Amino acid sequence: RDSMQGLGMMQIQSLTLSNDDDQFKLVRWDNVGEITRITNPITVDHTLLRQYLLPGLLRLLSSNRHHDLPQSVYELGTVVRDHKNASRLAFLVAERIGGFAAIRGRIQAFLRDLGASEYEIQTLPDNEGPWLAGRAAKVIVNGKHIGCFGEIDPFVGELFELKVPMNG
């Protein structure tokens, strides 16, 4: 939390309930393991327990698109994969300037704050997830893939009614 706040981000807490479109289709991610579905959902927007945090951040920025930029938010929250809870961190920055160099700098500062002195940043294949082709990477610490980051593809942003450059 201290690191994220030090990077100028505001903590949010989004709903753990989500839906297939937000979690998978709109952000171009595959489901990981078994999906925990709600037996009798009250709305079509809340049919499963989330596997990813980023779609909730995109929904939040979509709801706040009338506010001035930059908007920088993060969530340290729970996701459910294979019917098991797991803690995850995600952040999203909407800003007119920035791009891949800015997000990489934030990731490196975060890793430094965590004390990770040795890590690798490897380019992700094009069209993997919500990322803009050629502008995304994964982070490897001690041989383990711990996350990915990049610029959000403008096409994905438009699906959430966001027309501003974003990275996360």
Which stretches of residues belong to each language-model region?
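Extended beta-strand-rich architecture
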Residues: 1-168
